[in-house]
């Protein structure tokens, strides 16, 4: 959804005396950052909470590229629609997540979640096991103690190349 569309919905709600939206769910990860152009600044300026889904890019940011397909990738045809083709820039970013995770002694998922939190959003995570819950808690706790420095964030973001906007309904 474009920011102007979301604003239109807010206007309709206000004009009719309805409750306005207090949060926005949209796709956002190190591999898809198009919402940084309009939606995230709009939400931040109007006090709307941002709770993006798929911050681990359907599992791509949880393991070295090509090491194995996730269960979700094998069974979820929506995943292909959402992610599109994996680009060389995506592969480089995944490699950087892997490198930083190794340096800091944490999982790749922890790095990806910490990046989201550092960007001022609180992501929705699909946690299918106790290990995933523990990794997430660790990531959030370590984020508060400075897991990612500003240079780390720049390192993770540096290779990103803009993509066509994905419309999610």
Enumerate the language-model features and the residues they cover.
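Glycine/proline-rich, positively charged
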Residues: 1-34, 38
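Short helix-capping segments at alpha-helix termini
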Residues: 14-20, 105, 145-148
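Conserved short secondary-structure transition element at the edge of the structured enzyme core
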Residues: 55, 83-143
């Amino acid at each position: 959804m474009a920011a102007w569309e979301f604003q239109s919905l807010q206007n309709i709600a206000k004009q009719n005396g309805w409750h306005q939206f207090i949060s926005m769910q949209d796709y956002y990860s190190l591999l898809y950052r198009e919402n940084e152009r309009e939606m995230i600044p709009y939400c931040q300026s109007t006090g709307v909470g941002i709770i993006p889904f798929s911050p681990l890019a359907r599992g791509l940011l949880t393991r070295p590229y090509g090491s194995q397909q996730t269960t979700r990738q094998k069974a979820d045809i929506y995943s292909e629609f959402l992610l599109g083709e994996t680009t060389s820039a995506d592969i480089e970013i995944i490699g950087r997540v892997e490198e930083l995770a190794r340096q800091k002694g944490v999982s790749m998922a922890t790095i990806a979640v910490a990046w989201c939190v550092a960007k001022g959003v609180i992501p929705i995570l699909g946690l299918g096991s106790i290990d995933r819950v523990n990794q997430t808690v660790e990531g959030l706790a370590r984020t508060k103690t400075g897991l990612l420095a500003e240079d780390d964030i720049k390192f993770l973001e540096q290779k990103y190349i803009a993509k066509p906007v994905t419309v999610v309904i």
